[in-house]
């Protein structure tokens, strides 16, 4: 499987935020950064060797609200323009792969929702992530029909009906089936 975690933009000033993080997928579709300073930390992380995958067309109506990127002397059409500029790219780079320091910026000019709403678009997204993972980690992504998340004493597991295989997931120990109204211990 692939180790996945959420990174909150507001936490970028803390060094621990990027600890162990190799690839970061981000978008400003319908959500915008509260402060331009966050881009300093993102750009620094990429420069040191991180891979940033930016997904977005930057055309949603929230680009035009009066915010830091278009007030107080800033003349950016979208906050991403400031981020790209920080990484020595053009303000509006086309879809492609770019180097910045020891790191890489991959721009996918697609609104993230279209990866699931347009038939076949998920494959392009997956292949981009898989390629970045292979480049950075040196391993192929192992696709499975199940998810397992462990947090402390809790294990959350699910098997997908529509997936790469019909292989059952086997776990040892005692578990409660939350999808059964009687909550049996298995």
Regions found by a protein language model. Give the residues of each.
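A conserved amphipathic helix/loop scaffold
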Residues: 8-9, 13-19, 25-186
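Short helix-loop-beta junction
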Residues: 1-6
């Amino acid at each position: 499987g692939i180790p996945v975690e959420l990174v909150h933009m507001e936490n970028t000033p803390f060094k621990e935020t990027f600890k162990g993080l190799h690839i970061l997928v981000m978008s400003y579709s319908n959500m915008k950064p509260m402060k331009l300073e966050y881009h300093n930390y993102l750009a620094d992380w990429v420069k040191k060797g991180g891979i940033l995958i930016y997904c977005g067309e930057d055309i949603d109506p929230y680009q035009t609200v009066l915010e830091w990127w278009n007030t107080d002397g800033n003349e950016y059409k979208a906050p991403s323009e400031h981020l790209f500029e920080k990484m020595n790219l053009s303000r509006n780079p086309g879809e492609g792969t770019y180097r910045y320091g020891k790191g890489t910026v991959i721009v996918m000019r697609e609104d993230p929702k279209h990866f699931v709403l347009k038939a076949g678009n998920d494959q392009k997204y997956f292949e981009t992530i898989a390629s970045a993972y292979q480049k950075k980690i040196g391993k192929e992504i192992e696709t499975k029909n199940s998810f397992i998340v462990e947090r402390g004493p809790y294990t959350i597991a699910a098997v997908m009906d529509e997936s790469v295989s019909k292989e059952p997931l086997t776990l040892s120990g005692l578990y409660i089936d939350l999808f059964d109204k009687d909550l049996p211990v298995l």
